[in-house]
Curated annotation (Swiss-Prot):
The keyword Transport does not apply. SUPFAM superfamilies: Ribosomal protein S8 (SSF56047). One of the primary rRNA binding proteins, it binds directly to 16S rRNA central domain where it helps coordinate assembly of the platform of the 30S subunit. PANTHER family: 40S RIBOSOMAL PROTEIN S15A. This is Small ribosomal subunit protein uS8c. Keywords: Chloroplast, Plastid, Ribonucleoprotein, Ribosomal protein, RNA-binding, rRNA-binding. The lineage of its organism: Eukaryota, Viridiplantae, Chlorophyta, Ulvophyceae, OUU clade. GO terms for cellular component: chloroplast; ribonucleoprotein complex; ribosome. It is found in: Plastid, Chloroplast. Part of the 30S ribosomal subunit. GO terms for molecular function: rRNA binding; structural constituent of ribosome.
Amino acid sequence: MIYDTISDMLTRIRNAYLVKHETVYVLNTKINRKISEILKKEGYIESVNLSTNSLQKLEITLKYLGNQKKPGITNLKRLSWPGLRFYSNYKDIPPVLNGMGVVILSTSKGIMTDREARANKVGGELLCSIW
């Protein structure tokens, strides 16, 4: 049984990039769906679809750059996990690579990126960082 679906999703994506898979399947939860939609919107992955094999899986198509198939994501890092939560107000959200990366937060207004949280002036739990 998987207790931390976010860490599981990030690990599956990271491992799929390491072996250069085209697609990866992750559990279909609301938070995984929202995080994968943010990754798509930010341009880190190609697409997100419900799996045709099972309704409990999300099919994520990974993005590679150039002919050498460089991964679209350099690093995925889980910032807050079930045993240790990290919270931040909108003024103290840490920048990732001076704004080149993205921090994904869980706020009272939903799951959003660090830029959206600063614009809406809401803080929340730091879920993960991507660059």
